[in-house]
Amino acid sequence: MSEAEYLKAVEMLNIWAKAYYTQDNPLATDIEYDVLYKKVETFENEFPDLKVSYSPTNRVGDAVSEGFEKINHKAKMWSMEDIFDDNELLAWLERGEKAGLEFFVEPKFDGASLNLTYENGVLISAGTRGNGETGENVTQNVKVINSIPLQIDYKEKIEIRGEVVIAKSDFDALNDERANSGENLFANPRNAAAGSLRQLDSAVVKSRHLKFFPWDVGENSLNFKKHSEIMEFVRNLGFLKDDFVRVCASLTDLRKAYVDLHEMRERKDILMDGMVIRINELTKCENMGYTIKFPRFMVAYKFPPVEKATKLIDINLQVGRTGVITPVGVLEPVNIDGATVRNATLHNFDEIARLGLMKGDIVSIIRSGDVIPKITGVFGARRNGSETPIKRPEFCPVCGSRLLVEDIFIRCQNLTCKARIVNSLIYFCSKKCMNIDGLGEAIINTLFEKGKIINISDIYTLKADDLEGLEGFKDKKISNLLASIENSRISPLYRFITALGIEHIGEVAARKIAEIFGENWLNASFDEILKIDGFGEAMAKSFVGFCEINREKIENLLSFLHLSAQKTEISQNVFTKKTVVITGTLSISRDEMKEKLIKMGANVTNSVSKKTDFVLFGKDAGSKLEKAKMLGVKAISEDEFKEML
């Protein structure tokens, strides 16, 4: 094969791949493709200096990365404003004189946003959205996604933006495979797509069958007048095109498009959570510009949460670290929004009574985004007499001890109950507590069953000899685990207090105790604790009682640790003593943002109420942002947050 023949073969393979992967229109048999591919591969092995970057052999996916470098986008990747009903749509249309304009609409696929950069017709880089200006360089992984061309027929520099997704059918197959391997399941296709894109091993990425759907361009030198023309041009370069793309000229057209797309929601193999509406005329878009948060010329009309009916087969009882028994509904598997739902939390037995639940009932299940599936109602009229009552338990399902009823809670009081011990160990080692990487649920259960860890202090006496010979424990894993345990010995005091799992004492309360009492925290009296801002009698009683009963165990634990309790000096600012809820994806992790806010004197909570002062939201914010709007709580974007500092 000559160099000219090689280049022609590469071109032919790319044409065939484009027809197969993006047009669903094979131009060659698998055998023809494989034979030509092998010839190209042989030539490249003989003449590696002549190999071109857009060769299909670059999609093999055998590279393992050490991590991801940062990459800057030439043009900012903006978030979109969300709307949830026709009234909000009408209000958006009335802002900025949008009447009489043409609108481009398409599905809002729920995946991971990606920015591709091409120069001289060749893919040179790919970056995740990140904070909109800087993302992670995932070029190596993107090269194994078959629906992303390595070469395009356009020589000018251009950024092409879109969504990396995984089909529902591929998602189900992936989770089945993970279940068979004993791995944790992905919550939904969006998490699977985002997680796959950030795999260090591109062979894993290739096996996930990711797809890329373009939805915009960044930096470019195109001369089109309409967004629809740009997208037609981009898709003709070899990218996927969804079968639902419309140009609408009125509110009636937009409403019809939304209804039509919503009806397709279940049938589509790609998870979508709404419809994107944007002004089609590019000059008008440019004139309208941007707010601090969003483009003024586009909006995401979100779909309502998916609700399904299924059968409640049974009730499982879970025993938490404090002994509280939580009923979990076991469901006939049902697919909701791209995820197979098999369980739903029921919180407590008062909730079961409120709903009037019986085993065998047909129930209504709702799931929105990452929210835990919830039973919202019972179809009582569909009962056939086979249903059975759900009885409150009298004995612990794990240790058999008689249970104590405290208000709405039912509790196991046996401190040696296996479930309580194991869950306490898991909580102690968790990221927000002592952050012992490698000591997760599965490993803790194994170590407990083998008698290697019976209580928390046993963690700090573990030796390599204790771990050798256990299934899955090789030298490297043992070394990493022991190093992680060693690193946890030096920790902020508040993390240790949090890790003890004292009822009513979470991270925020633990921080206050650590800052006020420092090294003398263990000797704080009921009256002293009660004086702390935000503390009530239940919190004070729980903390002091726990410390009195477990003082010897705590002091033993402290002998293994070096804890610091530095008092933070807080300068008065807009967030001091304000209650803040964080939702959505930010440019930094949620824990990092939480730490920032706490250092400014804010109280960071998990749920939105009338007492919430701010909801800080990022990309893909869900029900918390909706609730903030409903309650009139001030919602701020990350950009607004920075402006307020």
Curated annotation (Swiss-Prot):
Q: SUPFAM superfamilies, alphabetically?
A: BRCT domain, DNA ligase/mRNA capping enzyme, catalytic domain, Nucleic acid-binding proteins, RuvA domain 2-like
What cofactors are annotated for this protein?
Answer: Mg(2+); Mn(2+)
Q: Where is the BRCT domain?
A: 570-645
Under catalytic activity, the entry for this protein gives:
NAD(+) + (deoxyribonucleotide)n-3'-hydroxyl + 5'-phospho-(deoxyribonucleotide)m = (deoxyribonucleotide)n+m + AMP + beta-nicotinamide D-nucleotide
Which positions does UniProt annotate for Zn(2+) binding? Answer: C396, C399, C412, C417
Ordered alphabetically, the record's keywords are:
DNA damage, DNA repair, DNA replication, Ligase, Magnesium, Manganese, Metal-binding, NAD, Zinc
UniProt-annotated catalytic positions: K108
GO MF terms listed in the record are: DNA binding; DNA ligase (NAD+) activity; metal ion binding
Name a GO CC annotation attached to this entry.
cytosol
Disulphide-bonded residues = none
Picking any one GO biological process from the record gives: DNA repair
Transmembrane annotation, as ranges? none
Q: Does the keyword Membrane apply?
A: no
| Enzyme Commission code | 6.5.1.2
Q: Which residues bind NAD(+)?
A: D30, I31, E32, Y33, D34, S79, M80, E106, R129, E163, K302
Q: What class of enzyme is it?
A: ligase
The entry sums up its family as follows: Belongs to the NAD-dependent DNA ligase family. LigA subfamily.
Q: What does this protein do?
A: DNA ligase that catalyzes the formation of phosphodiester linkages between 5'-phosphoryl and 3'-hydroxyl groups in double-stranded DNA using NAD as a coenzyme and as the energy source for the reaction. It is essential for DNA replication and repair of damaged DNA.
Q: Mind telling me which NCBIfam families this protein's record contains?
A: dnlj, PRK07956.1
Q: What is this protein called?
A: DNA ligase
What taxonomic ancestry is recorded? Answer: Bacteria, Pseudomonadati, Campylobacterota, Epsilonproteobacteria, Campylobacterales
Gene encoding the protein: ligA
